[in-house]
Amino acid sequence: MDTIRVSKEVPGSSKSTAQSLTESTSRTETINGSHEFKISGYSLVKGMGIGKYVASDTFMVGGYSWAIYFYPDGKSPEDNSVYVSLFIALASEGADVRALFELTLVDQSGNERHKVHSHFGRTLESGPYTLKYRGSMWGYKRFFKRSLLESSDYLKDNGLLVRCCVGVVKSRTEGPRCYNIPVPVSGLGQQFGKLLESGKGADVTFEVDGETFPAHKLVLAARSAVFRAQLFGPLRSENTNCIIIEDVQAPIFKMLLHFIYWDEMPDMQDLIGTDLKWASTLVAQHLLAAADRYALERLRTICESKLCEGISINTVATTLALAEQHHCFQLKAACLKFIALPENLKAVMETDGFDYLKESCPSLLSELLEYVARLSEHSLTSSGHRKELFADGCDLNGRRVKQRLH
């Protein structure tokens, strides 16, 4: 469908005054339809004479009536019945009907080697075909050589199958809509969030680091499979009205509840204040671990994205360890790529986070070494030698090694 936008300015308006602007849109598209015409008893219609035809029943496309005409002895005397002719004709009253056509002689062997003549799917130099009046035709006088047709897979059980597609071109102009009823955005998250803030109807309380957090069992169960099992599953605790959380810190649990109810990340400063120990990366790391524990996949992905954006020399090692522990493969790949860069490797190895990485995930060191080696193989100097990624003389465990000469 082609679209043309037209803007009109009121004449006589000056630059110093506000201009009145109106808009309209012209839309041109095709109304498509198809018809299958089966010709049985081909041997009986052959020989009926040049210019004689068999016609399909009429069919409607785009508000107009159409028919398929098959000439078994051809349409033109000059062809001397060497070719069969095939046409599509306008069968209803109409003037200057513009349309696209496709005529197909179907291969009845199942090999899909149809003979197709089509306007569709290609650029036409003069645009769609125009039929001026009832009886106007489009097609081919020499559609197929008759001798070849009679020995082909198009003829089966003394019958032919013709398929015709018609696309009638229609245009319309749309002006601005006079009436509009705005639909407000969903307030579901805000409504549940207000429910959390009010505490009304709360039927479970969580105790975290000496703080209490009231919540609603059904909301938690709907959002988290882990909470659903903990609150309503066969292995649920005897006391589901008060649950002690020991491995998640209070600010993180507060953010977790906020996401469950609001379905969006909270403002970190509003929830955790200005405590410097809760840097944004550290918050995202703890929140990712909590999201993984309670099977909140969307929150987990949000945390992965934030950690990926915040990768730096000082944070990448601990983030890599976290990604390994919680199977965050995309985040892990981003961390490995960052560390393996020659300008980053030495600095990362000198951080406390790298010491933590060696202790918590020693298997990652060999994986990192392989990654660096692969990168090294693709990093060649102009002389054809490898660049030395360990020019500082350290291995991945921080030990001094003898530098190689090139």
UniProtKB/Swiss-Prot annotation:
PROSITE patterns, per the entry? BTB (PS50097), MATH (PS50144)
Which cellular component terms (GO) are annotated to the entry?
A: nucleus
Q: Which UniProt keywords apply?
A: Nucleus, Ubl conjugation pathway
- Which InterPro entries is this protein grouped with? BACK_BPM_SPOP, BPM1-6, BPM_C, BTB/POZ_dom, MATH/TRAF_dom, SKP1/BTB/POZ_sf, TRAF-like
**Where does the UniProt annotation locate this protein?**
Nucleus
Which segments show compositional bias classed as Polar residues?
13-29
Q: In which tissues is it expressed?
A: Ubiquitous.
The question of whether Nucleus is a record keyword is answered with yes
What are the start and end residues of every segment in region (Disordered)? Answer: 1-29
Domain named MATH is located at: 32-166
The record's listing under SUPFAM superfamilies reads: POZ domain (SSF54695), TRAF domain-like (SSF49599)
Q: In which pathway does it act?
A: Protein modification; protein ubiquitination
Task: Output the superkingdom of the source species.
Answer: Eukaryota
Q: Which family does it belong to?
A: Belongs to the Tdpoz family.
Known partners and oligomeric status: Interacts with RAP2-4. Interacts with CUL3A. Binds to MYB56 at the promoter of FLOWERING LOCUS T (FT).
Function noted in UniProt: May act as a substrate-specific adapter of an E3 ubiquitin-protein ligase complex (CUL3-RBX1-BTB) which mediates the ubiquitination and subsequent proteasomal degradation of target proteins.
Task: Fill in the domain comment.
Answer: The BTB/POZ domain mediates the interaction with some component of ubiquitin ligase complexes.
Name of this chain's protein: BTB/POZ and MATH domain-containing protein 2
Task: Give the originating organism.
Answer: Arabidopsis thaliana (Mouse-ear cress)
